């Protein structure tokens, strides 16, 4: 429902400042309130297990979910609240032709102009129209906002999210994440060199980079250090045969003015070395101790002191905000990887290289305690590939959750011609092939499987009818409110989601007196969805002393 903004109208008709609603610095757009509401609106959906597409269903703790990622995130909220260690997403970059989600909030131009306050209800223009394409930014913001908001709920307190983006929306993405995650939780804006080869557009810049915005959920996060290479160690040498090994010289000056650290240093021959303007880095007593241990030495003419930083004292290296393609891979490397996996066919445009996601995992995870990695714009499933690769290399036990909308492939594409009718088919097959390749190359004993789920309508019938809509013949159909095509396993997954149980928990099925009984994580949950369960079966289930029991009725 549209309404007149009287405060704005008063200001437009006045040549002096009109008191009204207090202004504040914020990111806003037409449709933001609906986007916020959309994040909190419940859905009548569930996840259904697809065992035929899964690999090692009984033992795997990895997951692949087909469906709208907003719906999937909402369904995962109870089970994975505060449990995800790392999120990586590569969302649509808002090129004008990549909107494929149901909640795109697309507005006609005239409606956008009115909602954004550029005209009144009579069509009179209030300000010059400088935003003819602004509605596309609004659509994109409204699509991303609820997804990022729910994603934050899934992160652990020490969790981190990495977001790939390009120049078109990096500014809006930064402001939106500042609002959702908090500006104090902004970690870095990394520049990734996605291309090395020049594009050769004369008169224009050849663009070779994208961005990766990094946010923590809270200040409890900590980044892992990166491994050092020969390139990083080449500045270290041992010209004086120090028994502590290679070293390089370090700064001895204080960065801030410290009058209590201003003092002269006397050399072994009695010379005086005056302090730097801000003072030394340490107290006089500490300097004397470092001189006695050889950590601080004098140059040959005793005019200055040299501090030694030993290579053996360094634990890895700090990450930098520029990631070069030669270190983490480029888009061309991502294409080559897919080409190798799919027998020289490239079924996906611009896949991210495995090395890029590995770098993200190296920084945000350590492979211990079954850390969960989530990618809800998973595309060709590079993130799943990277999780298996790094687990094979360091013996980690990271688990992945991939979410992807089953977007149809173009009928003229190599993917379609190869039999992959949607992106999910590409992603699942990529995981299967990558797992086979990694296992053959490394022989590592890791989780190579994944459980497949599909977002679907609720397992329950809609039995809430008004009396005038209900016919007498319908009464028999309503005797059971469970849809006829749903199985006991469908019902089990819905119950697990409602109870907040992880879908990676071990599941087992047994037969008790002809009735199918489902066990989740031993006796954490026991469920039977058959009709007419006997008292004897109930007593046998009770003897297991389950934490939770669910029956059909």
Roles of regions detected by a PLM:
Residues 1-88, 93-146:
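DnaQ-like (DEDDh/DEDDy) 3′-5′ exonuclease domain used for proofreading
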Residues 124-139, 185-188, 199-200, 359-370, ...:
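Cysteine-dependent PTP/DSP-like catalytic domain, specifically the C-terminal lobe
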Residues 370-379:
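Conserved class I S-adenosyl-L-methionine
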Residues 498-517:
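Conserved helicase/translocase motor-coupling segment
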């Amino acid at each position: 429902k549209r309404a007149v903004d009287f405060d704005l109208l008063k200001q437009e008709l006045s040549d002096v400042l009109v008191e009204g609603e207090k202004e504040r610095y914020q990111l806003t757009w037409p449709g933001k309130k609906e986007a916020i509401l959309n994040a909190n609106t419940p859905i009548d959906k569930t996840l259904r297990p697809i065992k035929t597409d899964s690999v090692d269903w009984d033992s795997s703790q990895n997951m692949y979910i087909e469906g709208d990622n907003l719906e999937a995130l909402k369904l995962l909220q109870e089970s994975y609240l505060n449990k995800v260690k790392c999120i990586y997403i590569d969302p649509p970059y808002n090129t004008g032709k990549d909107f494929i989600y149901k909640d795109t909030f697309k507005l006609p131009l005239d409606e956008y102009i009115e909602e954004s306050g550029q005209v009144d209800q009579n069509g009179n223009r209030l300000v010059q129209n400088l935003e003819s394409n602004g509605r596309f930014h609004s659509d994109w913001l409204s699509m991303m906002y609820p997804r990022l908001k729910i994603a934050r709920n899934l992160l652990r307190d020490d969790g981190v999210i990495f977001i790939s983006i390009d120049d078109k929306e990096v500014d809006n993405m930064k402001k939106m994440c500042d609002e959702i995650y908090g500006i104090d939780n902004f970690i870095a804006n990394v520049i990734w060199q996605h291309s090395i080869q020049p594009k050769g557009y004369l008169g224009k810049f050849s663009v070779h980079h994208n961005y990766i915005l990094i946010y923590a959920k809270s200040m409890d996060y900590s980044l892992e250090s990166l491994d050092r290479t020969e390139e990083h160690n080449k500045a270290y040498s041992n010209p004086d045969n120090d028994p502590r090994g290679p070293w390089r010289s370090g700064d001895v000056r204080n960065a801030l003015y410290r009058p209590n650290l201003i003092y002269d240093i006397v050399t072994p021959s009695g010379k005086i070395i005056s302090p730097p303007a801000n003072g030394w880095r340490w107290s006089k007593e500490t300097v004397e101790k470092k001189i006695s241990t050889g950590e601080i030495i004098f140059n040959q003419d005793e005019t200055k002191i040299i501090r030694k930083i030993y290579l053996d004292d360094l634990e890895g290296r700090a990450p930098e905000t520029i990631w070069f393609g030669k270190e983490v891979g480029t888009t061309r490397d991502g294409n080559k990887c897919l080409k190798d996996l799919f027998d020289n066919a490239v079924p996906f445009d611009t896949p991210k290289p495995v090395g890029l996601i590995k770098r993200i995992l190296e920084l945000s995870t350590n492979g211990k305690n079954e850390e969960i990695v989530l990618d809800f714009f998973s595309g060709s499933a590079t993130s799943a590939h990277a999780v298996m690769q790094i687990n094979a290399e360091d013996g980690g036990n990271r688990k992945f959750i991939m979410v992807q909308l089953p977007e149809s492939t173009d009928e003229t594409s190599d993917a379609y011609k190869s039999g992959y009718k949607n992106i999910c088919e590409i992603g699942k097959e990529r995981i299967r092939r990558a797992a086979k390749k990694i296992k053959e190359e490394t022989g590592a004993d890791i989780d190579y499987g994944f459980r497949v789920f599909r977002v679907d309508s609720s397992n329950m019938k809609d039995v809430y009818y008004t009396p005038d809509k209900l016919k007498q013949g319908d009464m028999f159909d309503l005797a059971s409110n469970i849809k006829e095509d749903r199985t006991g396993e469908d019902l089990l997954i819905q119950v697990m989601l409602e109870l907040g149980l992880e879908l990676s928990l071990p599941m087992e099925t047994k037969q008790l007196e002809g009735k199918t009984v489902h066990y989740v994580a031993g006796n954490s949950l026991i469920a039977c969805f058959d009709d007419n369960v006997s008292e004897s079966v109930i007593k046998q289930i009770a003897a297991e002393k389950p934490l939770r029991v669910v029956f059909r009725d």
